[in-house]
Amino acid sequence: PRIIYHGMNRLFRSMDRGENFAPISPDLTRNDPDELGDIPFQTITSISESPFEFGRIFVGTDDGRLHRTFDSGKTWELITYGLQEERWISRVIASRWTDGVVYAAQNGKRWDDLDAYRGKSEENGATWRSIEDGIPGAPINVVREDPKNADLLYVGTDLGVYISVDEVSLAVDIGLLPLKVTVLPVL
């Protein structure tokens, strides 16, 4: 792809395959010096651009913030209302199937919170509702849509892989030990 996004505390974009990058956002993290500690965080952890519209971008951070822009970064809006407060946005996905649908997965391990948090918005993140049902207490690390079936979501957790069918999650035995899944290629 010609366009590449890179996140630190700000979002950068290259329009020439990574030869040159330019910032397209302000600091999207909390930027709280009291929270930096020995291992700094407050960085962008997930970026997703809508396949329906260039410049409609969703950005999640490891300090629980989720922003969106509809104009390639000229203006940004915080869209965490309805999500868990301060929980790491481990993955944000703009749906390939339905315009305006966005999924957000959150991870609370930093706070000793091992629950599964997954939200869905049908309004580009304006409001969120929980779709956590069926996943046991296991932080969610990755969410992927099925490339052929709009009703299937794959969820990678600290205890393995789950499939969500019409928003009801089922455990999937793929022959592996319960293990942490952070990358989930779906072909």
Where are these regions (language model features)?
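Beta-propeller blade termini and top-face loops
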Residues: 1-187
